[in-house]
Amino acid sequence: MKHTLTLLSLGIALTIMAQNKKTDIAKTQLVEHLSVLAHDSLEGRETGTIGLEKAARYLVAHYKKIGLKPFAANGSYRQWYKLPYAEDGMTTDKASNIIGMIEGESKPEEFVVISAHYDHIGKTATDVYNGADDDGSGTAALLAIASHLMEEKKQGRGLSRSVVFIAFSGEEKGLWGSEFFSDHPTFSLKKTTADINIDMIGRIDTERNKADTMNYVYVVGNNKLSSDLHPLLDETNAMGHQLVLDYKFDSPFDLERIYYRSDHYNFARKGVPVLFFYDGMLLGDYHQLTDEIEKITWELYKKRVDFITDLLKNFANRTNMLKRDIPLND
């Protein structure tokens, strides 16, 4: 009996150690996915075009390969919506958000969302805007994180809450996809503890000019909607990441109004606590032909993805959902 208890105690200890160990996402996965998403053949992934549809099919294929659970009754990962208006170059009047889930072990009816947008701004007659950072980097990370968490689940280290992976379309047009989703959610937003949104995490802010340039990430939203957000960020960082978490865009004097400019905002307006991870690349290559995969800072990109994955795990495994105790105050 004593021998059995010793083995049981050892097993519990090893499980706790595994859960507290810093995540190590395979860089090769990030490279593989981003090489496809930022390729000329996807024609800049503009909403309403065949390029976006090619990207959507790639995402659906990998959701299936990973084994994510679809929400639609017909087994589809797609949430279709009609485009608010047509623009020159569009070949269809609809687009889709790509939604899949890893079901939670003990609280499957509660959710953590991780989101990115897979659209970009398209092409001209002669050039393609590949959007490697914006937001190929977030979309590639979404797939790599999903693969990692599914593998952990198969090894008996599943998370308590369900994790929902959403690749939004229409972000560049005005947050179309996430607005439609938040008005027509496929699961309860009241039971959603948080949205972690990743939009541009593969580059550096060329205006930063600080010694920590290769070890930072901008975090937006830590002082809004929930007082639990900041402590959980610090707790996750102490797991061995030691990233510089820069909150400059949470200033009420932020002239760029970054908090309102990506898909997380459509969760926030519904009362869901959000965090937005961002590299700050506002100048230089932002929405330019030069936003190419060759300029991705791979080691820093991977550091950020590892941190975001561990934060997601902490959100999913904590005893209670995040408090909703701070008004948004638009």
Predicted regions, residues:
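Bacterial Sec-dependent N-terminal signal peptides
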Residues: 1-21
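Second-shell loop/turn segments in exported
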Residues: 20-24, 40-50, 86-88, 126-135, ...
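N-terminal capping segment at the start of a domain
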Residues: 25-54, 66-72, 279, 285-288
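Acidic/His- and Gly-rich active-site-bordering loop/insert found
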Residues: 37, 83-122
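A non-catalytic alpha/beta surface segment that caps or lines the substrate-entry region
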Residues: 45-102
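Alpha-helical metal-binding/catalytic segments enriched in His/Glu/Asp
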Residues: 98-100, 114-174, 308
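Metal-dependent peptidase/peptidase-like ectodomains
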Residues: 168-270, 274, 323
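His/Asp/Glu-rich mid-to-C-terminal helical/loop segments that flank catalytic regions of hydrolases
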Residues: 279-330
